[in-house]
């Protein structure tokens, strides 16, 4: 039962992370197209945002390992 719960948790986290990354990158590209002179600042902010979005699947992976090994 723990393996099923871990799989569902990882599925949800992967879908959420993928959608979140897509939104962050799309908005960054919109901003770069609108104001090319701010591309450096936007890129830096995008990398921070993608890192925060990717933290969710990593935490879900750790929690799913804990659930499976319980």
UniProtKB/Swiss-Prot annotation:
InterPro entries: ATP_synth_csu_bac/chlpt, ATP_synth_F0_csu, ATP_synth_F0_csu_DDCD_BS, ATP_synth_F0_csu_sf, ATPase_proteolipid_c-like_dom, F/V-ATP_Csub_sf. Pfam families: ATP-synt_C (PF00137). It comes from the Bacteria. It is a multi-pass membrane protein. Keywords: ATP synthesis, Cell membrane, CF(0), Hydrogen ion transport, Ion transport, Lipid-binding, Membrane, Transmembrane, Transmembrane helix, Transport. The record marks 54 as: Reversibly protonated during proton transport. Coiled coil: none annotated. Its main location: membrane. GO terms for molecular function: lipid binding; proton-transporting ATP synthase activity, rotational mechanism. The chain crosses the membrane at residues 4-24, 47-67. GO terms for cellular component: plasma membrane; proton-transporting ATP synthase complex; proton-transporting two-sector ATPase complex, proton-transporting domain. It is found in: Cell membrane. F-type ATPases have 2 components, F(1) - the catalytic core - and F(0) - the membrane proton channel. F(1) has five subunits: alpha(3), beta(3), gamma(1), delta(1), epsilon(1). F(0) has three main subunits: a(1), b(2) and c(10-14). The alpha and beta chains form an alternating ring which encloses part of the gamma chain. F(1) is attached to F(0) by a central stalk formed by the gamma and epsilon chains, while a peripheral stalk is formed by the delta and b chains. F(1)F(0) ATP synthase produces ATP from ADP in the presence of a proton or sodium gradient. F-type ATPases consist of two structural domains, F(1) containing the extramembraneous catalytic core and F(0) containing the membrane proton channel, linked together by a central stalk and a peripheral stalk. During catalysis, ATP synthesis in the catalytic domain of F(1) is coupled via a rotary mechanism of the central stalk subunits to proton translocation. Belongs to the ATPase C chain family. This is ATP synthase subunit c. It comes from Pediococcus pentosaceus (strain ATCC 25745 / CCUG 21536 / LMG 10740 / 183-1w).
